[in-house]
Amino acid sequence: MLRAIIMDIMDEVGSLRMSLFRRHRKKNLKSVSYTHLFPWEQVIPMAIAQTAGAFVGATIAAVFYYPHFKETGPDEGNCVGIFATGPAIDHKPCNLMSEIIATFMLILAILCLGKMVDGLAPVVIGILIASIGMSFGATTGYALNPARDFGPRLAYTILPIPNKGTANWQYAWVPFIGPLIGAGLAVVFFKLVAP
């Protein structure tokens, strides 16, 4: 998870001059359409690019950890949790609520940042992501973005990782739908209360 936070912050620092949407990619179709922060014609290509990027990142991790995977089995840590999110306790309604609330808080905070000085926004967003991880990470692993879970889960399924366990696809809808709902609700709430 620390790797994901560090990569997010590095991504933020590398994109300081981009729009609010591009400064933080944890938005979705609903928030894009409602806030008009991103052109519609770029929504699908951006979603595909994010998923492909997450897939490539998971592939790099699989190559890096390959010797460890050969020596371990699913009971020893060689599982999808290295790549994608998963529940500590499998209770879909609570897991979904955790993803909705975590994403709601993230998107609402990003929208509230508004015109914050570009150099400070990545720091604040990085701290926010770390805080959400400490608060909600134990319950579901906090996807916050469907691509962040789907791409690595797909990589885990496809790649020839030795001794691997199941990819837990029956859970995959939670980190996909939860962030979409949470971000959509955050945007609607922001529009209702913003001056």
Pin down the residues of each PLM region.
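Membrane-interface helix-loop junctions and terminal tails of multi-pass membrane proteins
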Residues: M1-P195
